[in-house]
Amino acid sequence: MASAFSPATAAPAASPALFSASTSRPLSLTAAAAAVSARIPSRRGFRRGRFTVCNVAAPSATQQEAKAAGAKESLRPVYPFAAIVGQDEMKLCLLLNVIDPKIGGVMIMGDRGTGKSTTVRSLVDLLPDIRVVVGDPFNSDPDDPEVMGPEVRERVLEGEKLPVVTAKITMVDLPLGATEDRVCGTIDIEKALTDGVKAFEPGLLAKANRGILYVDEVNLLDDHLVDVLLDSAASGWNTVEREGISISHPARFILIGSGNPEEGELRPQLLDRFGMHAQVGTVRDAELRVKIVEERARFDRDPKAFRESYLEEQDKLQQQISSARSNLGAVQIDHDLRVKISKVCAELNVDGLRGDIVTNRAAKALAALKGRDTVTVEDIATVIPNCLRHRLRKDPLESIDSGLLVVEKFYEVFT
């Protein structure tokens, strides 16, 4: 989805000199990371002040432990995406979101033990490379001001040449026990008021910028945290506000959630914010079940050899994704097909226009994945159940699955 903020509103323009909140004394630019304007509470109300934005100087023992744990986790072998047997609906939804992040993420619901988490985490190997500014906690894009952190934006305005490196798109796991401060980031209020320095420690949303944020068991996450995640995913920005001091930074990420419907459903308002919805069921075919068990046993026995056996398929799929991302802008969808998509949404009483927008985007992403520059009726038929089923109003007396209702209405309108 398009960002609701422009670079001008996201971070105020830089000034030649930075000043302390309490005095007019300039702050040292060597200690400053970025200039940000803030409203400071005083006896006479609020006044404006200029602050420096920086990371907390010395990481705590907890942060160092977390970093070490993250390094160990990255060394763990990941099950190859190409080796996942079945679950084509879930895999397609994930691939389409990687090709076009503006689809708005995917919610995966299904039985326990069906490979939801394994499939999502296996996506890591297929993610394309991106250019990022070296040492920036927000994974800033050196060429796009809208996805630059405040420090990088300030350096660009000063004409500094930024060191750039190519890195893989990151996937960040959000644990169920995460606090709001850990997710959004924290501001050291005492340091801000006494030293005039806005010491900001970025959270998981900053780390996930230009990447993927995965929430396992999202239906068990606190509602207010889900609201924060969905708002950031929709707007592309995260704002942290404490005691009248606020910081905004880019937070553009693909939100992927998974859960078991037996443990509780998400509120309809929250479900609607996910671009696509995939249903995962237990494989019933005996031959497929045996194949899954055997493949898993091979992976557990020798992960390295197992991954190497799928290297060619993985490379082919990665090239296909990279090509689709490059050609996505050239894909066209006929006006008549757009009208029919909107007619399906209207006749299904889908609230709002998110269903129309996401269906158009997903159909174009699928056409790009197949190497075409024109959307066909078959493309729309493939993606429309995943784009609309979670947006239908639930009728307790209705015995037909919502996905089947979408399919029935699709063929009624398109034939």
Swiss-Prot record:
Redox regulation; active in reducing conditions, inactive in oxidizing conditions. Thioredoxins f and m mediate the reversible reductive activation of oxidized CHLI. Pathway: Porphyrin-containing compound metabolism; chlorophyll biosynthesis. The keyword NADP does not apply. Its EC number is 6.6.1.1. Residues 1-67 form a transit peptide. Keywords: ATP-binding, Chlorophyll biosynthesis, Chloroplast, Disulfide bond, Ligase, Nucleotide-binding, Photosynthesis, Plastid, Transit peptide. Disulfide bonds join C93-C184, C345-C387. Signal peptide: none annotated. One of its GO terms (biological process) is photosynthesis. Involved in chlorophyll biosynthesis. Catalyzes the insertion of magnesium ion into protoporphyrin IX to yield Mg-protoporphyrin IX. The reaction takes place in two steps, with an ATP-dependent activation followed by an ATP-dependent chelation step. PANTHER family: MAGNESIUM-CHELATASE SUBUNIT CHLI, MAGNESIUM-CHELATASE SUBUNIT CHLI-2, CHLOROPLASTIC. The magnesium chelatase complex is a heterotrimer consisting of subunits CHLI, CHLD and CHLH. This is Magnesium-chelatase subunit ChlI, chloroplastic. It comes from Oryza sativa subsp. indica (Rice). The gene is CHLI.
